[in-house]
Swiss-Prot record:
Function: Probably participates in a plant defense mechanism.
Propeptide: 10-69, 100-103
Disulfide bridge positions per record: 73-89, 77-91, 82-96
UniProt organism field: Viola biflora
One Pfam family matching this protein: Cyclotide
Signal peptide: 1-9
Post-translational changes noted in the entry: This is a cyclic peptide.
Name of this protein: Cyclotide vitri-A
Cross-link (Cyclopeptide (Gly-Asn)): 70-99
Keyword check for Transmembrane helix: no
Family classification: Belongs to the cyclotide family. Bracelet subfamily.
Comment field on protein domains: The presence of a 'disulfide through disulfide knot' structurally defines this protein as a knottin.
Length: 103
C-alpha cells in the first residue's frame, strides 16, 4: 500500500468509490424511496470527498497489506474521517478499512 498512499496525497480531497458511497446510502436509508434524500447526501459527500472508480487501487491495497489492516472500504482518510464508519470502517494508514473478522 505504500506505493498507493502518496497518490491519495496528490488529491485535493479524500476519495471514495461509488460502491462505498452506495453502501453508506443503503445503511443510512435502506427503505427510503425518496431519491431527494440520497441526492442531498451524495452532494454533501461530493463536497468533502472525490468520487472515483478504481477497483485496481482497492485490489492493490488488499494485496500489499496481506489483510493486516482489514478489508479496504474504498475510501481514503488523509484529511476527512471515514464516511464509511457508518458501515463499520475505520481509518488506518490514511485508508478506511473494515475489520476482516467482523461480519
Amino acid at each position: 500500500a505504500a506505493f498507493a498512499l502518496p497518490a491519495f496525497a496528490s488529491f485535493e480531497k479524500d476519495v471514495i468509490t461509488p460502491a462505498a458511497l452506495e453502501a453508506v446510502l443503503n445503511r443510512k436509508a435502506p427503505l427510503s424511496n425518496i431519491m431527494m434524500e440520497n441526492d442531498a447526501i451524495v452532494n454533501v459527500i461530493a463536497n468533502v470527498k472525490t468520487v472515483i472508480s478504481n477497483p485496481v487501487l482497492e485490489e492493490a491495497l488488499l494485496k500489499t497489506n496481506h489483510g493486516v489492516n482489514g478489508i479496504p472500504c474504498g475510501e481514503s482518510c488523509v484529511w476527512i474521517p471515514c464516511i464509511t464508519s457508518a458501515i463499520g470502517c475505520s481509518c488506518k494508514s490514511k485508508v478506511c478499512y473494515r475489520n476482516s473478522l467482523d461480519n
